Swiss-Prot record:
InterPro entries: Glyco_trans_1, SPP-like_dom, SPS, SPS_C, SPS_pln, Sucrose_synth_GT-B1
EC number: 2.4.1.14
Inhibition and activation profile: Activity is regulated by phosphorylation and moderated by concentration of metabolites and light.
Keyword Lipoprotein: no
Protein name per its UniProtKB record: Probable sucrose-phosphate synthase 2
Segments of skewed composition (Acidic residues): 256-267
Broad EC category: transferase
Subunit structure: Homodimer or homotetramer.
Annotated signal peptide: none
Pathway assigned in UniProt: Glycan biosynthesis; sucrose biosynthesis; sucrose from D-fructose 6-phosphate and UDP-alpha-D-glucose: step 1/2
Length: 1081
């Protein structure tokens, strides 16, 4: 470098603006961490800007020469000393940036090695039946194009195995669920650009809901989002339900008359709706990074709505049987996490659209070298977001992307998706070859659609110059759109071609480079105006730090280049103004530009093309595919401002090129219509493995069912005497179940009770009958007492000794909890009890028997970490017979690869950390008696060698294996159950199956427990944490360093969680239950 005067200038500028802002963490240390839970500073920080320019733009030798010069010329003045000191401090930042870059390279290399090791293991496992054709699939590259069943050949994909969705499906009457949690979602007057959470995704999900509801065969679409009752936002966001009014008929897609008549004949529940579910603080509008601890609360609220809606739709169109969702579609990571849990609870297919991805954002932020991984996680909760995306990949049947680049360069970064492995598994599945329990979601490129109803484009695209002048002069001022006046008031000559940019003032949208390109190109300034639509604002100082910084920089650049009269930047616009803005740019023969560093898709490019505007767009991301389809503009490097200026100048100066791009865009825009999008979407969804609950919800009306229903009534009577007595006596949970009925009162008993007593007197309890009752599918198993319960107390205390054996303290706690419930007559009415444990059912039964507690005292037993659900028989059965729920077994079957998991887990546990050598002795051993068809139970022989859950889950995902792995029983056991099975999910199953509301469940836990402990805390149920009952858990084996935190899973300061002191008696426990019961009101 010839001279270092520019470095000196930067250093002098830093001194002038306040060098105190520099510290060792300016490149990404405490500055970011101090902002935890907040947005960036509200004011532009020039010191930070100059420091980043020096740190990023020079090497150490330049800094060293500058320091030598400062030392040589220093004097006694304080400024010289400060300048010398600052050289040292910035040099330290430069070294730190290089260290972060080195650590990033090491991390990427480790991930690459682990990925290759996973592929190697998969190849070895499947080598015995891997064909040459499949090997070709691994090595080859299969091109991916835009999915469009009716597109032209250039963008047509092979749909030979798929039946294209058409009017022949109009009799299906489907119920579709969409989820988009963050931001401000409403159907009209969307506040797009208000904040970083309310952007293009909000518009997309609302429009896709409307469009799907108009497709043949779709009866109802529910778009779930968060209900916000905060004074910070409009009252409309607190409305629980909003019907999405139908847009006017889409251009080029007019309905036939018979279709309109058919729409009128649909039931009252048909159409598209926004359903707002309250979760998290009711009076606060939370940014998306703060929603994570409340996800399970949303899931429970959404589950309640879906169950009720399915029943209502069943009455309307399902012949009395519930109409379950055809698909549950999550948008973004938070909704993907929710959709995965809902999919598991309902056993219906899940679809995912990422919109933007956490790993991609993490990689970009780390490459900048300004923040450490810990600081990034603190600000963006990025690790929690990434785990949600990984879970979404685990559960999703189908992942919708906008571009091919998103599949290969973004989803390819995830443990749960490998492009090469997906091709192999798809080929094997197509040929009927065993995949050894491995699964990969299918990826489909389906570009977003657009509503053309507000687009008015003249058929003749050859308007001459002066169209805008003609239009504005020939009409009265009142007929000119107000937004036109707002824009034109900035411009000295508003008739020049308009260069239009429309985006949030987000740093990644690269607006400042566009302004520099415009300001430094005099021919472009002479030919065109620049219009910047940068969201809505009242006061820059009240905006988030990043947005405020961009706007401040834009204003300074306008002043630097003296662009007054050439740049328009209105403060406000409505969503309904956007078409008029495009139309204004088109009338002036302008150009639309999207200069973002990376654009996941670029919906505004499609909108602009539909209004006849050629485009200049970034070459990174979705615009590449849009340009390939429309061929209506130029692609540029967003970092090259000269290339941006030249592309804009070329389009506005060459009229023939402008007209050609305009015509191409209008000719091909139909590829991005909503009907086309929805047709392709439904075609893809129809190819998913359809699954839904298999049971029938109505009780058979034959005599046997009636009699068994009366048995349930008898059990009610017995329950009230046995364990819900309120006579004040200290009855234990295992007291006699005999009932004495005074003869004098027999005549006054209700008819149903008398029928029950007559039935029980004539009941034959012989061996043959007992044998019949033990069969799976008997009525006691089908219709247990849970259907009559209004409250359920779920005891999930993980009390074990150091050897992993159940502790007797569990028995004492059970008895004290039951006694506490009996102390409150109101609470005890129609209340039941359930046990939730890692123990297998046989061990649990023996343990209860040893403690003199009958299994009949419980309505349900959730065993083996949620892999099995049992119901006890009636109280007349002294043998304590238990009935396995066969429906639950099929409910959790999804993506369970038992044999493949068994082989891979053994291999992983017997491999040293370097991945090359084998350990001397295996740290685990499969325990057959504790395992079942959906649970692999391992004894941990050496806990110090056990790999943490995060680490094991990553390795299994990289090998295409999906499961729920946990350590339990004081880290002495590891259990592997199906992906969507868990003790927490089993509670949601009980709600779906027996209509026992999760909000009426009370979950009793210790202060710690198995590694699935955190899952049991969150939700709409009430949680009682008993101190001092569980001394040691397994949570130290849950997370690796650098993973998400407990606070990202469990909500803080919630009224739904209460504590009982160590050694608490029934009187204190019941008082805590009373407080919790008020929290749900």
């Amino acid at each position: 470098m010839a001279g270092n005067e520019w470095i000196n200038g930067y250093l002098e500028a830093i001194l002038d603006t306040g060098a105190s802002a520099i510290d060792e963490n300016s490149g990404g240390g405490k500055t970011a961490a101090a902002q935890k839970g907040r947005h960036h500073d509200h004011h532009f920080n020039p010191t930070k800007y100059f420091v980043e320019e020096v740190v990023s733009g020079v090497d150490e030798s330049d800094l060293h020469r500058t320091w030598i010069k400062v030392v040589a010329t220093r004097n006694t003045r304080e400024r010289s000393s400060r300048l010398e000191n600052m050289c040292w401090r910035i040099w330290h930042l430069t070294r730190k940036k290089k260290q972060l870059e080195w650590e990033d390279l090491q991390r990427l290399a480790a991930r690459k090695w682990e990925r290759e090791q996973g592929r190697k293991d998969v190849t070895e496992d499947m080598s015995e039946d891997l064909s040459e054709g499949e090997k070709g699939d691994v090595m080859g590259e299969t091109p991916v194009a835009l999915d469009s069943p009716r597109g032209n050949k250039k963008y047509h994909r092979n749909f030979s195995n798929l039946e294209v969705w058409s009017d022949s499906n109009k009799e299906k009457k489907l119920y579709i669920v969409l989820i988009s949690l963050h931001g401000l979602v409403r159907g009209e007057n969307m506040e797009l650009g208000r904040d970083s959470d309310t952007g293009g995704q909000i518009k997309y999900v609302v429009e896709v809901a409307r469009a799907l509801a108009k497709m043949p065969g779709v009866y109802r679409v529910d778009l779930f989002t968060r209900q916000i009752s905060s004074p910070e936002v409009d009252w409309s966001y607190a409305e629980p339900t909003e019907m999405l009014s139908s847009s006017s008929t889409t251009a080029g897609e007019a309905h036939e008359p018979e279709e309109e008549e058919e729409e009128e004949d649909l039931g009252e529940g048909s159409g598209a709706y926004i359903i707002r579910i309250p979760f998290g603080p009711r009076d606060k509008y939370l940014r998306k990074e703060l929603l994570w601890p409340h996800i399970q609360e949303f899931v429970d609220g959404a589950l309640s709505h879906i169950v009720n809606m399915s029943k209502a739709l069943g009455d309307q169109i399902g012949g009395g049987q519930p109409v379950w969702p055809y698909v549950i579609h999550g948008h973004y990571a938070d909704a993907g996490d929710s959709a995965a849990l809902l999919s598991g609870a309902l056993n219906v297919p899940m679809v995912l659209t990422g919109h933007s991805l956490g790993r991609n954002k993490l990689e970009q932020l780390l490459k900048q070298g300004r923040q450490t991984k810990e600081d990034i996680n603190s600000m963006y909760r990025i690790m929690r977001r990434i785990e949600a995306e990984e879970l979404s990949l685990d559960a999703a049947e189908l992942v919708i992307t906008s571009t091919k680049q998103e599949i290969e360069e973004q989803w390819g970064l995830y443990d749960g998706f490998d492009v090469k492995l997906e091709r192999v598994l798809r080929a094997r599945a197509r040929r009927g070859v065993n995949c050894h329990g491995r699964f990969m979601p299918r990826m489909a490129v389906i570009p977003p659609g657009m509503d053309f109803s507000n687009v008015v484009v003249p058929e003749d695209g050859s308007e001459g110059d002066g169209d805008l002048a003609t239009l504005t002069e020939a009409t009265s001022p009142r007929s000119v759109p107000a937004i036109w006046a707002d824009v034109m008031r900035f411009l000295t000559n508003p008739h020049k071609p308009m260069i239009l940019a429309l985006s949030r003032p987000d740093p990644k949208k690269n607006i400042t480079t566009l302004v520099k390109a415009f300001g430094e190109c005099r021919p472009l300034r002479e030919l065109a105006n620049l219009t910047l639509i940068m969201g809505n604002r009242d006061d820059i100082d009240e905006m988030s730090g990043g947005n405020a910084s961009v706007l401040t920089t834009v204003l300074k650049l306008i002043d630097r280049y003296d662009l007054y009269g050439q740049v328009a930047f209105p403060k406000h616009h409505k969503q309904s103004d956007v078409p008029e803005i495009y139309r204004l740019a088109s009338k002036t023969k302008g150009v639309f530009i999207n200069p973002a560093f990376i654009e996941p898709f670029g919906l505004t490019l499609i909108e602009a093309a539909a209004h006849g505007l050629p485009m200049v767009a970034t070459k990174n991301g979705g615009p590449v595919d849009i340009h390939r389809a429309l061929n209506n503009g130029l692609l540029v490097d967003p970092h090259d401002q000269d290339a941006i200026a030249n592309a804009l100048l070329k389009l506005v100066s060459e009229k023939n090129l402008w007209n050609e791009c305009r015509k191409n865009g209008l000719k091909n825009i139909h590829l991005f219509s909503w009907p086309e999008h929805c047709r392709t979407y439904l075609t893809r969804v129809a190819a998913c493995r359809m699954r839904h609950p298999q049971w029938k919800t109505d009780t058979p009306l034959d005599e046997t069912a009636i009699d068994d229903s009366l048995n349930d009534s008898l059990k009610d009577v017995l329950d009230m005497s046995l364990r819900l007595s309120v006579d004040g006596e200290k009855m234990s949970v295992n007291e006699s179940s005999s009932v004495e009925l005074p003869g004098g009162e027999a005549a006054e008993l209700p008819d149903q009770v008398r029928r029950v007593l007559n039935k029980i007197k004539r009941q034959d309890s012989g061996p043959a009958q007992r044998e019949a009752e033990g069969k799976a599918g008997d009525v006691p198993g089908k219709y247990p007492m849970l259907r009559r319960r209004r409250k359920l107390f779920v005891i999930a205390l993980d009390c074990y000794d150091l050897k992993g054996n159940p502790d007797k303290k569990m028995i004492l706690s059970i008895q004290e909890i039951v006694r506490a419930v009996r102390l409150d007559p109101q609470m005890s009415r129609f209340s039941g009890f359930a046990l939730s444990t890692a123990m297998p059912v046989a061990e649990l039964a023996d343990f209860l028997k040893a403690g003199d507690v009958k299994v009949n005292d419980f309505d349900a037993l959730i065993c083996s970490s949620g892999s099995e659900v049992y119901y006890p028989g009636t109280y007349g059965e002294e043998s304590g017979k238990l009935y396995l729920d066969p429906d639950y077994t099929s409910h959790i079957e999804y993506r369970w690869g038992g044999d493949g998991l068994k082989k891979t887990i053994s291999k992983l546990m017997n491999t040293a950390e370097d991945g090359k050598s084998s350990v001397a002795s295996s740290p685990i051993e499969l325990v057959a008696k504790s395992s079942n068809s959906h649970c692999l139970s391992y004894a941990i022989k050496d806990p110090s060698k056990a790999k943490k859950v995060d680490d094991m889950r990553q390795k299994l995902r990289m090998r295409g294996l999906r499961c729920h792995l946990m350590y339990c029983r004081n880290s002495t056991s590891m259990q592997v159950v199906p992906l969507l099975a868990s003790r927490s999910q089993a509670l949601r199953y009980l709600f779906v199956r027996w209509r026992l509301s999760v909000a009426n469940m009370y979950v009793i836990l210790g202060e710690t427990g198995d590694t699935d402990y955190e899952e049991l805390i969150s939700g709409t149920h009430k949680t009682l944490i008993m101190r001092g009952v569980v001394e040691k858990g397994s949570e130290e084996l849950l997370r690796t360093a650098g993973s998400y935190l407990r606070d990202d899973v469990i909500p803080q300061d919630t009224p739904l969680i209460a504590y009982a002191d160590k050694g608490a008696k029934a009187e204190h426990i019941v008082e805590t239950f009373r407080q919790l019961s008020k929290a749900g009101m």
